[in-house]
Amino acid sequence: MIKVKEYRGHIRNWEELCERLDIPLDLTREEREEQILVKAYETWGNEMADHMHGMFAFALWDESEEKLFCLRDQFGTKPFYYYETADGKLLYGTTIRKIMEQPGFVKELNEEMLQLYLSLTYVAGEMTFFKGVKKLLPGRYLIWKDGKLAITRY
């Protein structure tokens, strides 16, 4: 069973996907997009982004595989962050605040990032102002399984 754990965004080609994935059109936007995410993952797996157009970032939990699958749209319109705890857990969310509210987060300033920002006035790459909190870069998906993290560009 696949569960949507986190979602932020909008799927622009929802009508086409509803037709292809046999999803009723009379659902609310929230229900419809949740079903699209689940059925697209069940149908296409890691390649689901090849079939979706829009701006989105999400996390799906695959109970049967005990695997977390997170994806960010190719343009990076919606953010997605993750953090590995000292005890081997993965915290994640579409905002840093969601990560900070979870047990296991250690709030520590990323001084290297602060120096870069003060020099360039721009935050680039996967680093954030909090040590250990990283951005999932645009056009990437993340898989967390058995305590191991793998990030792939799609």
Model-derived features: where do they sit?
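Cysteine-centered catalytic environments shared across enzyme families
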Residues: 1-154
